[in-house]
């Protein structure tokens, strides 16, 4: 019988999103920028550096905490009763490396994962080629990458995706048994319908539009499928691992009601909702301490990245060429 990933939360992630390869990446970029003798490939110095460091575990990257905690759902028993029995826990989460790295450098990625106890067994290493096309056969629920072009392509293919900011602050260690994820609303969880009104007509028109349509659910945005998948994982429950989600939005009353009613219509719950009315999100996120935050506007992502791991969802009207 063939193996498949049906029923799992599938996260595809690039090596730079999972591990801190920024020093190595600078060597790679230097190879591309400078002329090389005939026959010398631009990634030769990079490959040599990665091979020389094969036994040196890479430092955790911006999405490391998120991945480590999600994988812990595979180790956590479903209930206290199961925790007292030697039964194999359900395998609910699959993490797959999708990398522009070469296969030789891929050895260090897998070895680093093994060092940290991350049970990651699958990956593709495409030596400079975009890896996003492999998201479809994986049926991925999330793709994290440092390459904006790959993120855009994934979003166009209907996969929730975000460009990680490698220099983001790292996640808090205060919640070892709880995955904390924060989402922006418009153009992330929801469609950009309301955001288009705001950008075209201003705040007053936006508030009036949303108050008028409070009973009409918003269409889903690019991250609705991920929120639903996390909700299913949350509902399954374990005796050890939990998920806590937050909606962190620039909306304020009366526009809050349509957002809440939309989630109710989807039969999906979030644990916290912050209606900030344009206040900077960063300090609120610092207090929530998420393992990751997703937003469609780079200004909000930069604000967040000073305090928590953050990623840019290049979708909607706020992003030139967005979907």
Regions found by a protein language model. Give the residues of each.
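Short hydrophobic/charged patches on amphipathic alpha-helices used for structural packing
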Residues: 132-133, 282
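Asp-based, Mg2+/Mn2+-dependent phosphohydrolase catalytic module
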Residues: 2-9, 19, 148-181, 185-212, ...
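Short acidic-hydrophobic, aromatic-tinged amphipathic segments that line or gate anion-handling sites
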Residues: 122-127, 145, 162-164, 273-277, ...
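Short beta-strand/turn micro-motifs composed of small residues
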Residues: 15, 99, 145, 249, ...
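Conserved acidic residues
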Residues: 121, 141, 179, 271, ...
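Short, structured coil segments at secondary-structure junctions
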Residues: 116-119, 138-139, 157-158, 266-269, ...
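Alpha-helical substrate-recognition element adjacent to the catalytic core
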Residues: 2-129, 175, 184-275
């Amino acid at each position: 019988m063939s193996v498949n990933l049906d029923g799992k939360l599938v996260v595809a992630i690039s090596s730079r999103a999972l591990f801190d390869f920024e020093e190595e990446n600078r060597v790679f970029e230097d190879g591309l920028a400078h002329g090389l003798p005939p026959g010398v490939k631009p990634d030769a110095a990079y490959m040599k550096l990665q091979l020389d460091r094969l036994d040196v575990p890479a430092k955790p990257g911006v999405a490391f905490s998120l991945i480590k905690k999600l994988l812990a759902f595979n180790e956590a028993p479903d209930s206290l009763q199961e925790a007292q029995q030697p039964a194999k826990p359900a395998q609910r989460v699959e993490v797959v490396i999708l990398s522009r790295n070469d296969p030789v450098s891929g050895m260090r990625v897998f070895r680093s994962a093994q060092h940290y106890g991350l049970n990651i067994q699958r990956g593709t290493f495409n030596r400079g080629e975009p890896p996003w096309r492999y998201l479809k056969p994986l049926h991925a629920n999330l793709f994290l990458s440092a390459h904006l072009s790959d993120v855009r392509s994934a979003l166009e293919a209907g996969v929730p995706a975000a460009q990680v900011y490698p220099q983001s602050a790292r996640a808090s260690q205060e919640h070892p048994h709880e995955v904390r994820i924060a989402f922006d609303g418009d153009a992330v969880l929801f469609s950009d319908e309301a955001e288009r009104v705001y950008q075209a007509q201003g705040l007053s028109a936006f508030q009036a539009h949303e108050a008028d349509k409070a009973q009409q659910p918003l269409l889903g945005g690019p991250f609705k499928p991920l929120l639903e998948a996390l909700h299913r994982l949350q509902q399954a429950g374990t005796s050890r691992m939990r998920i806590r989600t937050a909606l962190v939005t620039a909306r304020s009353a009366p526009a809050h009601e349509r957002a809440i009613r939309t989630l109710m219509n989807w039969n999906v719950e979030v644990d916290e909702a912050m209606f900030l009315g344009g206040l900077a999100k960063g300090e609120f996120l610092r207090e929530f301490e998420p393992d990751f935050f997703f937003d469609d506007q780079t200004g909000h992502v930069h604000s967040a990245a000073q305090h928590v791991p953050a990623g840019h969802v290049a979708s909607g009207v706020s992003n030139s060429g967005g979907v």
